[in-house]
């Protein structure tokens, strides 16, 4: 059995297979997922698993170099947005250089088709979606 926080086999494989600048999306329960993109559906019920818990576990194993968010997230769901930014800031304090980019929600939905996978959570907070660009550890 794995010893680290990320126990889900599909997610663990996804993170291990990422190359530099590959993207993954972590989304709320309502974001449309392109048919051609791998879907890792974790949603059990409203709020389970939570978006921020899923992000926290993925960041425990994934090196990131970029973060893409819908600009609407900041205004509509400021508390969850702030919690996400705090996690990104912790990654920066650990020495990571991370670019934060805001785009429209429509552009965000289109951009998800570039992701290697979309991870669907049970989150029901509006605009609780993020695209992470993979970094390297060297």
From Swiss-Prot:
Which residues constitute the catalytic centre?
20 (proton donor)
According to its UniProt record, the EC number is: 5.4.99.62
What pathway does this protein act in?
Answer: Carbohydrate metabolism; D-ribose degradation; D-ribose 5-phosphate from beta-D-ribopyranose: step 1/2
Q: Which UniProt keywords apply?
A: Carbohydrate metabolism, Cytoplasm, Isomerase
Q: Where in the cell is it found?
A: Cytoplasm
Q: Which chemical reaction does it catalyze?
A: beta-D-ribopyranose = beta-D-ribofuranose
Q: Which domain of life is it from?
A: Bacteria
- Name the Gene Ontology molecular function terms of this record: D-ribose pyranase activity; intramolecular lyase activity; monosaccharide binding
Which InterPro entries does its entry note? D-ribose_pyranase, RbsD-like_sf, RbsD_FucU
The biological process GO terms on file are:
D-ribose catabolic process
Write out the residues that bind substrate: 28, 105, 127-129
Q: What is its main location?
A: cytoplasm
- Top enzyme category: isomerase
- What SUPFAM superfamilies does the database record attribute to this sequence? RbsD-like
Pfam families assigned: RbsD_FucU
- Provide one Gene Ontology cellular component: cytosol
Q: How is this protein organized at the quaternary level?
A: Homodecamer.
Function comment: Catalyzes the interconversion of beta-pyran and beta-furan forms of D-ribose.
Q: Which family does it belong to?
A: Belongs to the RbsD / FucU family. RbsD subfamily.
Which HAMAP family does this UniProt record tie to the protein? D_rib_pyranase
Question: Which PANTHER family would you find in this protein's record?
Answer: D-RIBOSE PYRANASE
- The protein's name is D-ribose pyranase
| Name of the encoding gene | rbsD
């Amino acid at each position: 059995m794995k010893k680290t926080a990320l126990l889900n086999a599909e997610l663990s494989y996804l993170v291990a297979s990422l190359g530099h600048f590959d993207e993954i999306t972590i989304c709320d329960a309502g974001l449309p997922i392109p048919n051609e993109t791998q879907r890792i559906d974790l949603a059990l019920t409203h709020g389970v698993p939570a978006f921020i818990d899923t992000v926290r576990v993925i960041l425990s194993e994934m090196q990131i170099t970029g973060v893409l968010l819908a600009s609407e997230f900041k205004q509509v769901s400021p508390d969850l947005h702030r919690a996400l930014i705090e996690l990104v800031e912790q990654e920066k304090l650990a020495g990571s250089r991370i670019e934060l980019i805001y785009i429209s929600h429509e552009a965000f939905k289109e951009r998800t088709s570039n992701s290697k996978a979309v991870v669907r959570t049970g989150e029901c907070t509006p605009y609780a979606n993020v695209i992470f660009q993979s970094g390297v550890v060297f």
